[in-house]
Amino acid sequence: MSSLRGLGNIARRWRELNGVSYWKGLLDPLDVDLRNNIINYGELSQAAYTGLNRERRSRYAGSCLFSRKDFLSRVDVSNPNLYVITKFIYAMCTVSLPDAFMIKSWSKAAWSKQSNWMGFVAVATDEGKEVLGRRDVVVAWRGTIRMVEWMDDLDISLVPASEIVRPGSADDPCVHGGWLSVYTSADPESQYNKQSARYQVLNEIKRLQDMYEHEETSITITGHSLGAALATINATDIVSNGYNKSCPVSAFVFGSPRVGNPDFQKAFDSAPDLRLLRIRNSPDVVPNWPKLGYSDAGTELMIDTGKSPYLKAPGNPLTWHDMECYMHGVAGTQGSNGGFKLEIDRDIALVNKHEDALKNEYAIPSSWWVVQNKGMVKGTDGRWHLADHEDDD
């Protein structure tokens, strides 16, 4: 998140910044408080990437590296004291998906053969409530793992979304079958997915709404790539089925593929108290996919990282789609007819956190964020072993 000073106006303007008026007059040029608000949620979305164990040699591949208690500080969120994580989300999928979506351990003693850690639910602390102006409940969904080649391998079939969209709100709302399967799949024999990711989140939303029923609350959903698609479905589900109890629900999604058909868009647009801002990087190919039969929901904010003087030109599909590059673009965009100037003091080294996007003259290594020694620790016997998992309290 940006500095606390940068978040200073959010408490006063949060309804406007979360889209009560559909962000009219705030996008071109981009309002500075909205920049900070977007990056606030963007960092939580990035955290769901950073916290994932990607090492397939580990028995914990596909799980979270850190415990809930220390998670936000361990993944280096700028203001970790604003939120406390109340629940981790786990998902499985009953349709075939490319490896970019679900990480499977090569170990015979894998922590789970089906499930992956897919994000978290968090709620504003008392300190966060002061800064943010209300008790904000956040759901952050993890996205795909770096690769974009999955677009060539993924079935784009639409399936009915009758579970998600309330009856009568549209004629025949349908969503991408793969996105819906990740959201709704469950297995009574599974340790982590006896409940689907959907019901893990909805039940936690209900619990937190009941806990803070006498306070002003909001629900904010965020995600990038696959996580953006899941965030769109989740936000629609929460409002369509009344889990928000009339408190406003906003989604901030980054690099989102398309989610559903025109009837799903119609259902989304007709839902009360529901807003969605799609942040899209002009050269990124993912938001253009799938094409046939799909329609965009929500309000679009277009950025163009190609205008940044800090990034290598022309870039490549990985850097165009990278979440840190998206936040860099939000920090510096000057609107559709402008250039690029960082309006927020956001460290340019972050764009190389997981990619090789920054110009070499800045002397920042590529893909520099790694767990110390890749999780290897030296035991008292002098031998090294992999210890890349913290038990969740």
Swiss-Prot record:
Q: Does the keyword Cell inner membrane apply?
A: no
Q: Which residues form a coiled coil?
A: 200-220
Catalytic machinery residues: S225, D284, H321
Instruction: State the compartments where it is located.
Output: Cytoplasm
Tell me which EC number(s) this protein carries: 3.1.1.-
Q: Which domain of life is it from?
A: Eukaryota
In Gene Ontology terms, what is one molecular function of this protein?
A: phospholipase A1 activity
Gene3D superfamilies referenced in this protein's UniProt entry, alphabetically: alpha/beta hydrolase
Q: Which PROSITE patterns match?
A: LIPASE_SER
What role does it play? Acylhydrolase that catalyzes the hydrolysis of phospholipids at the sn-1 position.
Protein family membership:
Belongs to the AB hydrolase superfamily. Lipase family.
Name of the featured protein = Phospholipase A1-II 1
